[in-house]
Curated annotation (Swiss-Prot):
The protein's name: Divergent protein kinase domain 1A
GO cellular component: endoplasmic reticulum membrane
Cross-referenced SMART domains: PIP49_N
Cytoplasmic side: 1-27
PTM comment, free text: Among the many cysteines in the lumenal domain, most are probably involved in disulfide bonds.
Native organism: Mus musculus
Record's bilayer topology term: Single-pass type II membrane protein
Residue spans, topological domain Lumenal: 49-428
Gene this chain is encoded by: Dipk1a
TM ranges: 28-48
Tissues where this protein is expressed: Ubiquitous.
Localization per Swiss-Prot or TrEMBL: Endoplasmic reticulum membrane
Keywords annotated in UniProt: Disulfide bond, Endoplasmic reticulum, Membrane, Signal-anchor, Transmembrane, Transmembrane helix
Length: 428
């Protein structure tokens, strides 16, 4: 009896093992298929996103077609379209309409920017810049004199910057920049390129601040494509992750990761001083005040000497221009009165329209960005004072009495505190 039971058990065991192996095989195949499916989907989405965001070939074709037919001209045109010594490298675009690439021009590294597929009207919800027509580069027209072109540029600056007393000097500066071949004359093609570029706030700011340390230098242009000097580090933080990974990383943990991939504290302090100096540059400069409307780490970079360099200035806009466009905008709450990410005005509920006064000055937004950046790893002997000054800075309001005096005092105190601490360190 016992012997027969044992025999039955031995007979049943292979069937059990076979069933278990079949189950494991099916499970393995299912998970393998799932991995392949998810991986393929991620690759497809990444490729689709890349092809939508990164359209350098289309941009080059549009520009070069216009150059070869004599519509536009500029110092970068021949290198881009004939000798092909200006070429696009890594894509940095975050919007299809604003193409941005690391590039090389005659063996010199640079950043190439180009505008794509943009409508002619002003849309406050997206941009503060008039966009291309279907027929590109239509102004100035053939027969326009240099004097007439100067009047066009003057009127544009008056609309953007307000009635500044020295706009004529800026017009002459633009004519010098537009003369790409340095022959003392501005051709029609060069004028068309310059006019298209002057619609872009970043280009205008690069010209206005061309002698300032923290503004990238303009290397050249062709149409509304332009090349600016390269920046070695294109974010305050040294780690960039694929967007898929970003989805699964909690924001608190992401901030901790960011802090791990930053320079030493004295070097961070030097970068921070650079940002404070840039705020000074755009605050009541020679051609009015500019507002920083996207003060984020991704728009700031630095070079090998840890000098701050602006990477993206497209959301730095003339205050006069912003006020004129926002003041009659319909609103139901303050949330409707925002340009970029952090240029905010208030909503007047009696008229249901946005007011024109921006609430938070550039310095307060810069200090908000620098708070975590500087306090992490700050020397113990200055941490308390540094924190106190940063919070005083963040609390600044445009509407406060004697705001300009407070602005200057806080900015100078912060710079002095940081410089005193790093003046005698090798890292600075």
């Amino acid at each position: 009896m016992a012997r027969s039971l044992c025999a039955g058990a031995w007979l049943r065991k292979p069937h059990y093992l076979q069933a278990r192996l079949s189950y494991m095989r099916v499970k393995y195949l299912f998970f393998s298929w799932l991995v392949v499916f998810v991986g393929s989907w991620i690759i497809y989405v990444q490729y689709s996103t890349y092809t939508e965001l990164c359209r350098g070939k289309d941009c080059k074709k549009i520009i070069c077609d216009k150059y070869k037919t004599g519509v536009i001209d500029g110092p970068a045109c021949n290198s881009l379209c004939v000798t092909e010594t200006l070429y696009f490298g890594k894509c940095l675009s975050n919007k299809p309409s604003n193409q941005m690439y690391l590039g090389v021009w005659d063996n010199l590294p640079g950043v190439v920017k180009c505008q794509m597929e943009q409508a002619l009207h002003l849309d406050f919800g997206t941009e503060l810049e008039p966009r291309k027509e279907i027929v590109l580069f239509d102004k100035p027209t053939r027969g326009t004199t240099v004097q007439k072109f100067k009047e066009m540029v003057y009127s544009l600056f008056k609309a953007k910057l307000g009635d500044q007393g020295n706009l004529s000097e800026l017009v002459n500066l633009i004519l010098t920049v537009a003369d790409g071949d340095r022959d003392g004359q501005v051709s029609l093609g060069e004028a068309k390129s310059a006019w298209a570029l002057l619609q872009l706030n970043e280009f205008l700011l690069m010209v206005i601040l061309q002698d300032k340390e923290h503004t990238p230098k303009l290397m050249g242009f062709c149409g509304d494509l332009y090349v600016m000097e390269s920046v070695e580090y294109t974010s305050l933080y040294g780690i960039s992750l694929p967007w898929v990974m970003e989805l699964f990383i909690p924001s608190g943990f992401r901030r901790s990761m960011d802090q791990l991939f930053t320079p030493s504290w004295p070097r961070k302090a030097k970068i921070a001083i650079g940002l404070l100096e840039f705020v000074e540059d755009v605050f009541h400069g020679p051609y009015g005040n500019f507002l920083m409307c996207d003060t984020s780490a991704k728009n700031l970079g630095y070079n090998e000497k840890y000098d701050l360099k602006m990477v993206d200035m497209r959301k730095i806009v003339p205050e006069t221009n912003l006020k004129e466009l926002i003041k009659d905008r319909h609103c139901e709450s303050d949330l409707d009165c925002v340009y970029g990410t952090d240029c905010r005005t208030s909503c007047d509920l009696s008229t249901m329209k946005c007011t024109s006064e921006v609430i938070q000055p550039n310095l307060a937004k810069a200090c908000q960005l620098l708070k975590d950046y500087l306090l992490h790893g700050a020397p113990s002997e200055i941490r308390e004072e540094l924190e106190k000054q940063l919070y005083s800075c963040i609390a600044l309001k445009v509407t406060a009495n004697q705001m300009e005096m407070e602005h200057s005092l806080i900015l100078n105190n912060l710079k002095t505190l940081l410089w005193k601490k790093i003046s005698y360190t090798n890292d600075s």
